Amino acid sequence: MNDGKRAVTSAVLVVLGACLALWLSGCSSPKPDAEEQGVPVSPTASDPALLAEIRQSLDATKGLTSVHVAVRTTGKVDSLLGITSADVDVRANPLAAKGVCTYNDEQGVPFRVQGDNISVKLFDDWSNLGSISELSTSRVLDPAAGVTQLLSGVTNLQAQGTEVIDGISTTKITGTIPASSVKMLDPGAKSARPATVWIAQDGSHHLVRASIDLGSGSIQLTQSKWNEPVNVD
């Protein structure tokens, strides 16, 4: 594989991993490294009503069979390796995904996942890059991590009113995510980071948007088309 294709491959894996990590959930979270354990996270430090809202959103996300995820960045996000945006349709059971990304200002670079294989379309040809398990980095694509790990340790929750996103009325909540969770999106993270979530107010408790401030830049993931049929073939 030439250097250009290898760079695109790595970038696609990271951004796809961010999408899957946000909404795919499993039964457990990986054990944090010793240096990350520090002071145990105490969710009781936050407003119980806001914690309940977060938990309901987690439960709703765990039940998804398909979703569309739009990834947008601001500033400098080194972990995405040149990708500044992506739009991905993801289906569970069996896992499949298809999308396009903007890589180093080149728009519309297609990629897909089928049968545990990931492919990227470069120079008008689809190239099979192998299985996700062989190509992905440790925790990014692990379905056992998922949204539960990303948001379950959030502290310092504060209500920030309401906001309409793509026609959906949402509750806006800010909080702090521990470094062990931030590493799902930024493997080099060493400290907790502020995050914001927007949760649908229509009774579905869908996670409409999540934004994580990584310091030099931020990653925003917006979900839509929950449980709608998606074309990932």
UniProtKB/Swiss-Prot annotation:
Record remark: domains: Forms a U-shaped beta-half-barrel with a large hydrophobic cavity (2835 Angstroms(3)) which is large enough to hold a single phthiocerol dimycocerosate (PDIM) molecule.
Gene3D superfamilies: 2.50.20.20
Main location group: other
Protein name: Putative phthiocerol dimycocerosate transporter LppX
Name of the gene this protein is made from: lppX
Annotated membrane topology: Lipid-anchor
Protein family (similarity comment): Belongs to the LppX/LprAFG lipoprotein family.
Signal peptide: 1-26
Stored PROSITE patterns: PROKAR_LIPOPROTEIN (PS51257)
